[in-house]
Amino acid sequence: MPSIKSDIEIARAATKRPIFEIGAKLGIAAEQLVPYGHDKAKVSAEFIAAQAGKKDGKLILVTAINPTPAGEGKTTTTVGLGDGLNRIGKKAIVCIREASLGPCFGVKGGAAGGGYAQVVPMEDINLHFTGDFHAITSAHNLLAAIIDNHIYWGNEENIDIRRITWRRVMDMNDRALRSMISSLGGVANGFPRQGGFDITVASEVMAILCLATDLKDLERRLGDIIIGYRFDKTPVHARDLKADGAMAVLLKDAMQPNLVQTLESNPAFVHGGPFANIAHGCNSVTATKTALKLGEYVVTEAGFGADLGAEKFFDIKCRKAGLRPDAAVIVATVRALKMNGGVKKEDLGTEDVAALKKGCANLGRHVANVRRFGVPVVVAINHFVSDTDAEIAAVKEFVSRLGAEAILCQHWAKGSAGIEELAHKVVELAESGQAKFQPLYGDDISLFEKIEIIASKIYHAGEVTADKAVRDQLQSWEEQGYGKLPVCMAKTQYSFSTDPNLRGAPEGHIVSVREVRLSAGAGFVVAITGEIMTMPGLPKSPSAERIFLNDQGYIEGLF
């Protein structure tokens, strides 16, 4: 039996086309690309601005059920579907997020797809790529440095150091940095205060980069960032400290979308990378809107399950950017359905149709939720070799009872040839005119009501709890004019509830909001629930322990 190649072996063996050829497929002239080597480039802001009058293509969202810790192949399916659409004669472009080093060296792995449905150069994309995350981290931490420097030199803005909300960031999972005291060591080092680090993908600067439409909008949003409060409790903005201009300079190149290619030499934009459990979970508006002007079909993904990524895609990204999705694909795997049915991780490779049927309640909830936004749905069963015919048949039967269709997809093993059926179905749905997109809630209800609507309608919670300080903070923001903003829920990705161990489709649970953060520049309010952390930690045995350079100088263990 031939050995199965790893993702990195498949990617390394790929025949990549020069990036100028990929750009030419989209009508992008060589002089409008800023190359980073031979296989990746940024698309110039001038070219993007010139596309404004063109008609938009069809927008397809790929989302998923609540995942296992390894993920269910959402990015793999996004890439595979893009290749599949091109295979059947449609001009399709893939739009995905950039990879964070945290999960690369943690447990989940990279974010370039898998098997024969990958974007390349996989190693570059999963590591430093074009330096966007470095630029975002630098811009974020420049503001942090300016805050402490301002206080050191006399604190002209009367910033209350007890009420500074701006933390530092780094692109790594490091629980030791969550909470700390800075400026220790005497008078020369400033005024000691409590602070900490978040992971870069949770940074408001990341969200701003992904929601800004151009450099002018970027700088305006950066200036709107609230870093804390004065002694009179009025907000202090980044522009009050004259930080917005320098931050925009650091982000100037990062604002330009990155163009790469799939293994089948089809175009892909990889740009921005907020997590969906602690941020809004979507690639950049700039990349998505550019792709819509250049392709007939744009396939994009939103992080984790549809309760997180898809809800934020609809309620934040589409609302803010004026996007109207034409169809949605919900990725399900037999193993994740069995886990939602109560099967232990070590037993997921054993057939268990009864547990799978029980776990299908999770899939059913996600189908209903996406339909709630007025978007037609098809289910993609991402095939694993351990799946049995009986298990696949059970999923298809369950979905058919919902009035939808579940299609077995084998793009991981077969590339575009393994996903043609799904591609045809997506075209059928997108061309049908069924989509009647609308957000879940309006702008004018209170912030707490928005949280309650998401919790009750999407999570099926029975109650939302928050202490008086949280409720008062929300009311204060409403009085300051921020009441019309959407809400970004920070919640575990493993359950509809705030308990990662509560699988399936729980009803009547309690969603506890322990903290709220105002992202005035990004334009949303973050509600932090349960035990979710904005700086993750590494697992007991992180992937980093198995990543190394071999004798030939090639990377091993990256996936």
Swiss-Prot record:
Coiled coil: none annotated. Pfam families: FTHFS. Transmembrane segments: none annotated. One of its GO terms (molecular function) is ATP binding. ATP binds at residues 68-75. Its EC number is 6.3.4.3. CDD domains: FTHFS. Keywords: ATP-binding, Ligase, Nucleotide-binding, One-carbon metabolism. It catalyses: (6S)-5,6,7,8-tetrahydrofolate + formate + ATP = (6R)-10-formyltetrahydrofolate + ADP + phosphate. One of its GO terms (biological process) is tetrahydrofolate interconversion. Pathway: One-carbon metabolism; tetrahydrofolate interconversion. Signal peptide: none annotated. InterPro entries: Formate_THF_ligase, Formate_THF_ligase_CS, P-loop_NTPase. HAMAP family: FTHFS. Belongs to the formate--tetrahydrofolate ligase family. This is Formate--tetrahydrofolate ligase. It comes from Rhizobium etli (strain ATCC 51251 / DSM 11541 / JCM 21823 / NBRC 15573 / CFN 42). The gene is fhs.
